[in-house]
Amino acid sequence: MPILHIQLGGQGKTPDGKIVPLPPAIALQQRGPVVQVSVSLQESYAKALVQQGNPLPQPMTGFALLDTGASNTCIDDEVAQQLQLPVIDVGSMCSASHAKTPSNIYPIQFSVIGFPIQLQCPRTMGAALKEQGLMLLIGRDMLVYCTLFYNGGTGQITLCI
């Protein structure tokens, strides 16, 4: 079982504008449990593209939030467009801030940097995540395969897949 153990870090500004390092516990509180990921087209769709003689879009890397509040994994819509992901369906997204909103559904695969595993996520919802500095929200549909330990006091997370 692969294990990833990280301690978050970051920087903040003092009232006079000086940049200072943040204690790990504060960095984890402010940013949440984030990991670096590589995202690409789901394997079955990628194989079909190759069989047709089409080039595969290059994977993209960025940050993902391990989000126990999200029922589904979500990808930033702009990232989905840059990866030229096909829209395979339209679903309804609900959140604490808005009622049902139409959302494109994309087939992706992703890996958490540091893990030797490609995770297939065939029904990933599109969302506006760029403003939060995120590429993905890893929701409960994928976290069901994981053990996550969140140690707020030390600013550390441990993820087992």
Task: Mark where each language-model region is.
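Pepsin/retropepsin-fold aspartyl endopeptidases
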Residues: M1-I161
